[in-house]
Amino acid sequence: MKVEAQEYELKTGEKILVREGKVADSGALLKTEREYILTSRYLIVSPSDLEQTVADEARWIKELNKNPSSLLLLALHNGNVIGHIDLTGSGEEYEEQSGLISMGMLQEYQNKGLGSILLRVVVEWARQQHQLQVLCLQVSRANKGAIRLYKKAGFKTEGKQPDLAPEEQVDDSESVIMTLNL
């Protein structure tokens, strides 16, 4: 186990559990991911992302759990998956020092402190990993709340990447690249 399960309190007083994701969570995580993919104005996805199967999700979780520089954390409320954060460390020898972060949560749990909790736990874990030196992420320029969250956690804007998605899919298809030196 890379991270011990721990209970946290959201700004609303609701208790959530943050723990590592397991292969057995594949179906529940996939269901939650589909919900926030379909309801978010900011996630940049392709139609193939919605074609992911439970078996695909299980393989992905297994690979993350096998990689010592990767981590998948789930946030649960009343036993239900409400969000996740994953840090994918590269398996390539020349890229071992970097990790890519991805996070998502159900709309009703946004702006309640869940993103801050998940980000804090994954950054603390990454700082304990001797091979990781920098964390990277990509966020829609229109997602001002997420950008504020990442900046508050110490991430710096490194650049932009235009035209990642059709304009009708997101408010602004330009993506911001951010990094955090550990």
Model segments located where?
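Conserved acetyl-CoA-binding loop-helix of GNAT-fold acetyltransferases
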Residues: 103-105, 111-126, 148-152
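A short beta-loop-alpha structural element at the N-terminal edge
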Residues: 16-31
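Short acidic N-proximal helix/loop "leader" segments that mark the beginning
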Residues: 1-12
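Acetyl-CoA-dependent GNAT
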Residues: 11, 37, 49-108, 119, ...
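Helix-loop element at the rim of GNAT/NAT acetyltransferase active sites that forms part
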Residues: 12, 31-48
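Conserved GNAT acetyl-CoA-binding A-motif
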Residues: 119, 126-138
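C-terminal "cap" of GNAT-fold acetyltransferases
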Residues: 133, 140-147, 160-182
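Conserved acetyl-CoA-binding loop of GNAT-fold acetyltransferases
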Residues: 151-161
